[in-house]
């Protein structure tokens, strides 16, 4: 996947890009089945909600051949090389479950705030790519963004260790209110929540302010996140476990574009 000048301009202005149906139904079925298998594991990389439901599976690409293919997929890697102008490595890989009825909130935050404070990442030359494994609906905990908020740099944040089972550097209500007011568009809205079918992809800037509400519906909302960082911008502090913030800065070598599809068809033929 190659980004056009118009897409790059939109990313620089809005802070994110949305690509509906980036992966096929066959590819996503393979990934979804693998996600269900991984979320059933009892491993240290599986972070759980306070209820015990799976919240996040970290580093799945290190113990799943299927997710190892996704972590090297050219549809995700090539646009990042294009934006950063250099090779990238996997800083973090996570599967967020947002389980039906039990998926908890992710508070308003900037990802680069964590990467800088906890991991010593020098600059926001890293970003997230979100791959929808389930349909993301307006009511099952969609990602919410404040457009253009990446332009304000890294904002002051507090370390919230109590709201959910996962500690997070979060923004206060006054900051979020101000950013939303300044982002209001022609429709009078300062927040967007992209929705779409499984296989859709969002790429967003490391400083873009975002959150997601709890999922109180019967509809699960699994999303895989790749955090890709420019190799020259690798982290310098190792306060978090290696399976949360990776220390292998080797440039990603992409697989063939049809690698996931071939794996899915091979599995179906078994």
Give names to the regions the model predicted.
Residues 1-14, 19-121, 239-240, 244-258:
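Non-heme Fe(II)-dependent double-stranded beta-helix
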Residues 24-25, 95-98, 136-138, 150-151, ...:
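Short, solvent-exposed loop/turn segments at secondary-structure junctions
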Residues 41-46, 52, 198-203, 207-270:
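Non-heme Fe(II)/2-oxoglutarate
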Residues 92, 124-130, 140, 191, ...:
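Extracellular structured ligand-interaction cores
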Residues 94-99, 110-112, 127, 131-135, ...:
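Short, structured patches in soluble enzyme cores that scaffold and shape functional sites
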Residues 104-108, 117-119, 139-145, 154-158, ...:
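A short secondary-structure junction signal
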Residues 118-138, 195-198, 227-230:
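Short, conserved beta-strand element in jelly-roll/cupin
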Residues 139-208:
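Double-stranded beta-helix
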């Amino acid at each position: 996947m190659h980004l056009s000048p118009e897409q790059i301009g939109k990313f620089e202005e809005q802070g994110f890009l949305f690509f509906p149906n980036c992966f096929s139904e066959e590819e996503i079925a393979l990934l979804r089945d693998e996600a269900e298998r991984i979320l059933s594991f009892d491993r240290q990389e599986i972070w759980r909600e306070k209820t015990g439901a799976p919240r996040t599976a970290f580093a799945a690409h290190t113990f799943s051949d299927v997710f190892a293919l996704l972590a090297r997929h050219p549809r995700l890697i090539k646009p990042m090389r294009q934006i950063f102008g250099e090779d990238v490595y996997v800083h973090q890989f996570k599967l967020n479950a947002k389980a039906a009825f039990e998926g908890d909130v992710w508070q308003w935050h900037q990802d680069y705030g964590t990467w800088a404070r906890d991991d010593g990442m020098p600059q926001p030359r890293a970003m997230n790519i979100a791959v929808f494994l389930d349909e993301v609906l307006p009511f099952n905990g969609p990602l919410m963004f404040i457009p253009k908020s990446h332009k304000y740099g890294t904002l002051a944040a507090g370390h919230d260790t109590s709201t959910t089972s996962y500690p997070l550097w979060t923004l206060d209500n006054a900051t979020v209110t101000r950013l939303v007011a300044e982002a209001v568009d022609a429709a009078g809205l300062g927040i967007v929540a992209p929705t779409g079918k499984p296989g859709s992809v969002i790429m967003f800037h490391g400083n873009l302010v975002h959150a997601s509400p709890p999922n109180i519906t019967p509809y699960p909302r699994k999303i895989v996140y790749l955090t890709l960082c420019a190799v020259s911008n690798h982290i310098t502090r190792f306060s978090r476990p290696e399976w949360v913030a990776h220390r292998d800065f080797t440039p990603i070598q992409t697989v063939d574009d049809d690698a996931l599809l071939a794996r899915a068809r091979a599995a179906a033929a078994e």
